[in-house]
């Protein structure tokens, strides 16, 4: 019998100074993902395709891809406890002025890793993504 692992849900909202289609591509295109995270990413932007990010630390599968407004992934890290099921990551992208409101719900995260992942999303995704778009002349963003 598999052991029960307590899980948590992480919710975050971020405003990014780029249109939803560009944010969507940055999150689903391996080349763009690697560019803004400055780490290796693999995979294709197709439903059912497997992907890796952060030099293989993150791995998963695209479950739903609705360009340019919704991304749903099965998602795990190499530090997931043995026997833990993949989490479910959902990102919704909504136009907000000339930018995008990104709404993330990351459910089924092992509770012991929730605080680290909550901060990790900010430090390793949202900040670099905002900086990457700013370097492309997109301006500043808010969290």
What are these regions (language model features)?
Residues 5, 108-143:
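A conserved amphipathic terminal alpha-helix motif
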Residues 27, 74-75, 121, 126:
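Tryptophan-centric aromatic hotspots in well-structured domains and transmembrane helices
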Residues 34-42, 52, 56-108:
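Hydrophobic-ligand binding "helix-grip"
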Residues 11-12, 22, 51, 106, ...:
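Generic anion/oxyanion-binding catalytic loop in active/binding sites
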Residues 11, 18, 49-54, 116:
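Alpha-helical scaffold segments that form or flank carboxylate-/histidine-based iron centers
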């Amino acid at each position: 019998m598999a052991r029960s692992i307590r899980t948590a849900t992480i919710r975050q909202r971020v405003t990014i100074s780029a249109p939803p289609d560009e944010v969507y591509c940055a999150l689903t295109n391996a080349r763009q993902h690697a560019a803004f995270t400055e780490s290796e990413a693999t995979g294709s932007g197709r439903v059912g395709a497997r992907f890796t990010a952060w030099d293989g630390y993150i791995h998963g599968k695209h479950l739903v891809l609705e360009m340019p407004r919704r991304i749903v992934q099965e998602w795990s890290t190499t530090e997931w406890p043995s026997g833990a099921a993949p989490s479910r990551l959902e990102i919704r992208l909504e136009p907000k002025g000339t930018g995008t409101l990104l709404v993330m719900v990351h459910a089924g995260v092992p509770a012991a890793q929730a605080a680290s992942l909550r901060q990790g999303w900010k430090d390793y995704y949202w900040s670099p993504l905002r900086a990457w778009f700013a370097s492309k002349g997109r301006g500043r963003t808010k969290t």
